[in-house]
């Protein structure tokens, strides 16, 4: 049976300075309570889905957005009146069988977002979040992490919500590409519409010109401030690209495929990045950022 939300509460389980899990307690319409424990990965997946719907709401025209805000505020007020209590013992003696191993967005079409949570004991729970409840839920999650004095973790999670990494690449002198692959589930692919190739042109410690890059999916097709910010945040996310933090770079961006057309293969993605590298050294190079 699906779990609907009447109120939520959150708390953080930590060991020394290490985040262990976020406790999410949900009060249902008939006042039944359910408690889940979520790792960083599952929290990020939940927030990616929530933030995607919020992004859609921000694109509404003024009248529709005002109507949404008024309805949202009424729901938030009701949720604030129904916050379930989290007991200290529930955190100290957390039931491992309530740990969420995987989270999947299974329905994103109507006013509700439906998630399937697979728990540690193998059981599955269906969680339904109404779009008017999203801001309150997201706020409760981030507040709990900040309140646990783990602000850096909150910033790291929230910096990864508006793009989907697919490949990270180092371009070799012989033209080959050395790359890492990030396998993403279909439901995440469906939240992002555009494939972008990003190329970083820089000089190594010896002064030799080098190229690294990435292929990501985003919600914006045209390079602008949002895409520029993503190209910077990718350096914090990617182990392969971390070496570029603080290094002067020319950054080239090309839209490979727009509007969630047919999914691109690995070969198509890497070939697009290779072509961008070739073009970046020619007279017809796209403008660097």
Swiss-Prot record:
Highest taxon, organism lineage: Bacteria
Pfam family of the protein (one): YjeJ
The protein's name: Uncharacterized protein YjeJ
